[in-house]
Amino acid sequence: MIAIIETGGKQILVKEGETIFIEKIEGAEGSKVTFDKVLLLDNKIGKPYVESAKVIGEIQKQGKAKKIVVYRHNAKSTHKRKLGHRQPYTRVKITGIVG
C-alpha cells in the first residue's frame, strides 16, 4: 500500500516499512506520529485530502543534515560574507497506512 502525505510544505511518497527523512517535527525518539494530510491512498485521490485516511510512523532520530556553506563576494570591493547552515530533520519509520 502506498500513500502521498503532506508534511513540512513537501509531498512525500511513502510505503509501509519505509524510512523517510522529513522537516523537523516535535517529538521524542521512539514516539508515535500520525500524518492526517494524505493526498493519495493507492487509487483514491483526495480533494484536497483523502477522508479518514492516515499514515502512522515512529520517530527514529532527530538530527541535523550536513553543513552547507554560503559564500557571497562583491567584486571590486573587500566585502565578503561566509555563512554555514545545517537543516534540522526527523527520521521517521512508517509503521502503518490506514484508510
Curated annotation (Swiss-Prot):
Keywords: Ribonucleoprotein, Ribosomal protein, RNA-binding, rRNA-binding. Pfam families: Ribosomal_L21p. The keyword Chloroplast does not apply. It comes from the Bacteria. The keyword Ribosomal protein applies. One of its GO terms (cellular component) is ribosome. GO terms for biological process: translation. Transmembrane segments: none annotated. One of its GO terms (molecular function) is rRNA binding. Part of the 50S ribosomal subunit. Contacts protein L20. This protein binds to 23S rRNA in the presence of protein L20. Belongs to the bacterial ribosomal protein bL21 family. HAMAP family: Ribosomal_bL21. This is Large ribosomal subunit protein bL21. It comes from Mycoplasmopsis agalactiae (strain NCTC 10123 / CIP 59.7 / PG2) (Mycoplasma agalactiae). The gene is rplU.
